[in-house]
Amino acid sequence: MRLRYIYAVLLCVLLAANVEAQVYIDSTEVARILGRQPAQTAIVQEYTVEDGEGEDDTGIPEFQTDARLSWKENIKARLDGILQGSLVETTQVGVMVWDLTDDCSLYSYRERMQMRPASTMKCVTAIAALDRLGSDYNFRTNIYCTGDSVDSTGVLKGDIYCVGGMDPMIGAGDISAIADSIKAMGVRIINGSIYADLSFKDRDRLGNGWCWDDKNPTLTPLLYGKRDEFTTRLRSRLREMGISLSGGAGERTLPGNAKLIVTRTHGIAEVMRPMMKQSDNLYAEAMFYQIGAAEGCRWSSAKQSATYINGLIRKVGLTPNNYNIADGSGLSLYNYVSPELEVQLLRYAFKNRNIYDTLIETLPIAGVDGTLKSRMRGTAAANNVRAKTGTVMGVSSLAGYLTASNGHQLCFAIIINGGMRNGPMRSLQNRICVALSQ
């Protein structure tokens, strides 16, 4: 009687506990369902999920492997168990895993559901940019001058034109190098103004579907330290070097008779690294607009870039009308993709080494760097998973590559919409990655 009372008390405590539980069904249960053995008691692994989990995942238990099942069946058993928890009941979850070695689907769960991707949208942008522009592409900022040659007294009777190419990496070193090039012409006085040519992209300073009260990047073709301060900084640097200007600063389109002074460049891989490793939204938008500009039009727009991406979606065998590409960073509320789309683009990249070799070097590495530095540490996924994270209010996602225990190369996408806490959503993603890695 006393023993029953103790059991009752313990049950009440467990029911009152404010936790979420994910339940794993062991592979032996799958074998029973497949009819390979008599009914047995399934081994159930219970794992408590607290808010904020995912920052340190040393507590993720090892997954059991049933020798009677194939590798693929063991993977299915593990992922089916992970996806039986309460989080899946209260949110929208989509998962797809592709075996790149055998070139076939390994696992799928609501993989065609249209969902907001958050920053895994940057994978779409990166792959499309490398496909359209190539791995040798450079972001360019060109500086021109008008007027005759500098006279014997060091006077330039003309204007300086700064033609922006939406390079987010322009910094103090670039401004100094530009000023040095102007001084090297023998210029001491500029009888003219400094103009910004902003015709690289349209006039939209914010992306379509961005929340006005968020901390959003400013979308301008001429940047300095991520700010719209290029011409101001150049004027200041010229004055510091003893070069005076008689005119002011403004915006004007480059005239046809202007002469090139200097070009500052940054390579696509150089820009893509912070875009992916640190999930920099401005860098992603700059990358996105390069795609549209590559079509040969001035005033590049998000629509032009999306048109190219829609063509790529068609190229990988999917229907563009099933998705909506609104921006390059994933900030827009109007982006809608699916795990299947992200996986098929990752698969396409893997098959094209000119894309993959650059992309794989820019993705965060679990437990090592970027936005995955503090995730999956001490697990089989650490230093193995290379993937892009995604987080906005109510959305958490993860998409990338890993190597399975049998040596197979895999790509995957996990998108969760509707969750109110990041911890449980990230924890589910982490456990899937560990299950695939073990």
Where does each model-flagged region fall?
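C-terminal soluble interaction/assembly domains
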Residues: 324-438
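Bacterial Sec-dependent N-terminal signal peptides
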Residues: 1-27
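Active-site-adjacent, His/Asp/Glu-enriched structural segments that form or flank metal-binding
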Residues: 135-202, 210-217, 224
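Beta-lactamase-like hydrolase cores
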Residues: 26, 31-101, 107-111, 178-184, ...
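Extracytoplasmic
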Residues: 88-92, 110-112, 118-121, 136-138, ...
